[in-house]
């Protein structure tokens, strides 16, 4: 199983990215959810503008699909500057980063997605650029090689990562602002779904938006993807308008249940319950039982189930919680 093939995957495809870009909020006033992040960024941005400074370097981390790229775009728009976008894997050589840095205008934003994947060589170039707005470049080779310093305009680096723990300490410590994005609450997701529906020219009831939001795993990217598939269903099977009943029919047909679980989520939970009596079960046995790689279980399937309280990871193995038993209408065994 490939994570990107799942309807409830938080990862993004290139085509999807282009569609989502059109419906993203452009300013903090339009930004829904993440109230602490929003209120803090309002102050930091306003203070930087009052002083006439570039905003401090910003690190944004959290699960995929929660709006790290959206927030970077909002920062650039609020500051009234250009946004230059790249990613850690793309910056293979020090020269790749140097080319981007030397093309920045004063106060511009450089956004590096997947910043935890920067190579050590590129990261070393970034340190003086972040601290002193200087670029150290080696000219020539061998004994004749010499270092020259190039002054850079003040700029803001925004780094985004799903794995903050993978950042080196020297890099992490150079960010003046660090923001963590959390899974969204259902009312906020409902607002996002309604807003996206309006952008798409859809007739959708509040209850229909709520039904999509409930099944979106706390993630705006998934909410927008489910909305597009519900739209298809409504246009083909009905008159195009989306009620709660139409949304539920569409998502049931797509095998996304009331908790936002798909076939693979349910397969894993039912294996623990039916084949291993609720657990504990070792990871290798569980992987063999459902025909998946252990890495897929650890990195793709487990995190959301654990976060929502349906699965426990214990020293003896994985266990289904009472909530998991109840989800399938199965009576959990009596505890000894």
UniProtKB/Swiss-Prot annotation:
First-listed, main subcellular location of the protein, grouped into a coarse class? cytoplasm
Fetch the SUPFAM superfamilies from UniProt.
Answer: P-loop containing nucleoside triphosphate hydrolases, Winged helix' DNA-binding domain
The domain comment in this protein's record states: Has 3 domains, the large (RuvB-L) and small ATPase (RuvB-S) domains and the C-terminal head (RuvB-H) domain. The head domain binds DNA, while the ATPase domains jointly bind ATP, ADP or are empty depending on the state of the subunit in the translocation cycle. During a single DNA translocation step the structure of each domain remains the same, but their relative positions change.
Q: Which HAMAP family match?
A: DNA_HJ_migration_RuvB
Q: What does the record give as the function of this protein?
A: The RuvA-RuvB-RuvC complex processes Holliday junction (HJ) DNA during genetic recombination and DNA repair, while the RuvA-RuvB complex plays an important role in the rescue of blocked DNA replication forks via replication fork reversal (RFR). RuvA specifically binds to HJ cruciform DNA, conferring on it an open structure. The RuvB hexamer acts as an ATP-dependent pump, pulling dsDNA into and through the RuvAB complex. RuvB forms 2 homohexamers on either side of HJ DNA bound by 1 or 2 RuvA tetramers; 4 subunits per hexamer contact DNA at a time.
Q: Which domain of life is it from?
A: Bacteria
Give the EC number(s) under which this enzyme is classified: 3.6.4.-
Segments of this protein annotated with the region Head domain (RuvB-H): 258-336
Q: Where does DNA bind?
A: 294, 313, 318
Q: Region (Small ATPAse domain (RuvB-S)) spans which residues?
A: 185-255
Q: How does it assemble?
A: Homohexamer. Forms an RuvA(8)-RuvB(12)-Holliday junction (HJ) complex. HJ DNA is sandwiched between 2 RuvA tetramers; dsDNA enters through RuvA and exits via RuvB. An RuvB hexamer assembles on each DNA strand where it exits the tetramer. Each RuvB hexamer is contacted by two RuvA subunits (via domain III) on 2 adjacent RuvB subunits; this complex drives branch migration. In the full resolvosome a probable DNA-RuvA(4)-RuvB(12)-RuvC(2) complex forms which resolves the HJ.
* Gene Ontology biological process: DNA recombination; DNA repair
What GO MF terms are annotated? Answer: ATP binding; ATP hydrolysis activity; four-way junction DNA binding; four-way junction helicase activity
- Could you say which residues bind Mg(2+) here? 69
Q: Which reaction does it catalyse?
A: ATP + H2O = ADP + phosphate + H(+)
| Record: residues binding ATP | 23-24, 65, 68-70, 131-133, 174, 184, 221
The family this protein is said to belong to: Belongs to the RuvB family.
Q: Which NCBIfam families match?
A: PRK00080.1 (NF000868), ruvB (TIGR00635)
Q: State where the protein is found.
A: Cytoplasm
* Keyword set, alphabetical order: ATP-binding, Cytoplasm, DNA damage, DNA recombination, DNA repair, DNA-binding, Hydrolase, Nucleotide-binding
Cited InterPro entries: AAA+_ATPase (IPR003593), AAA_lid_4 (IPR041445), DNA_helicase_Holl-junc_RuvB (IPR004605), P-loop_NTPase (IPR027417), RuvB-like_N (IPR008824), RuvB_C (IPR008823), WH-like_DNA-bd_sf (IPR036388), WH_DNA-bd_sf (IPR036390)
Which organism was this protein described from? Answer: Klebsiella pneumoniae (strain 342)
Q: Which CDD domains match?
A: AAA (cd00009)
Name of the protein in question = Holliday junction branch migration complex subunit RuvB
Q: Could you tell me which residues belong to the region Large ATPase domain (RuvB-L)?
A: 4-184
The answer to keyword Signal applying to this record is: no
One GO cellular component term noted in the UniProt record for this chain: cytoplasm
């Amino acid at each position: 199983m490939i994570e990107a093939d799942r309807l409830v995957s938080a990862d993004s495809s290139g085509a999807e990215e282009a569609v989502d870009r059109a419906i993203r909020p452009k300013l903090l006033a339009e930004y829904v959810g993440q109230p602490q992040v929003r209120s803090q960024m309002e102050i930091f941005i306003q203070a930087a503008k009052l002083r006439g400074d570039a905003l401090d370097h910003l690190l944004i981390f959290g699960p995929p699909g929660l709006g790290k790229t959206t927030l970077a775009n909002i920062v650039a728009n609020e500051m009234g500057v250009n946004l230059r976008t790249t990613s850690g894997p793309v910056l293979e050589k020090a020269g790749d980063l140097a080319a981007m840095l030397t093309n920045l205008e004063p106060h511009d934003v450089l956004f590096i997605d997947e910043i935890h994947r920067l190579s050590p060589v590129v990261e070393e170039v970034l340190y003086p650029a972040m601290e002193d707005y200087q670029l150290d470049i080696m000219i020539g080779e061998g004994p004749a090689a010499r270092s020259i310093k190039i002054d850079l305009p003040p700029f803001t680096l925004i780094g985004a990562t799903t794995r903050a723990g993978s950042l080196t300490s020297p890099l992490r410590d150079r960010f003046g602002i660090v923001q963590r994005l959390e899974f969204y609450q259902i009312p906020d997701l409902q607002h996002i779904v309604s807003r996206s529906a309006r952008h798409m020219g859809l007739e959708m009831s509040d209850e229909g938006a709520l039904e999509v939001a409930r099944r979106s795993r706390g993630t705006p990217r998934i909410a927008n993807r489910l909305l597009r598939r519900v739209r298809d269903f409504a246009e083909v099977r009905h008159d195009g308008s989306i009620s709660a009943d139409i949304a539920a029919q569409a998502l049931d047909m797509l095998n996304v249940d009331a908790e936002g679980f798909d076939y693979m989520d349910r397969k894993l939970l039912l294996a623990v319950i039916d084949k291993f009596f609720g657990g504990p079960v070792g990871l290798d046995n569980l992987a063999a039982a459902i025909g998946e790689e252990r890495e897929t279980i650890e990195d793709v399937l487990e995190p959301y189930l654990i976060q929502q309280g349906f699965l426990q990871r214990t020293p003896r193995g994985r266990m289904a919680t009472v909530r998991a038993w109840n989800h399938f209408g199965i009576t959990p065994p009596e505890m000894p």
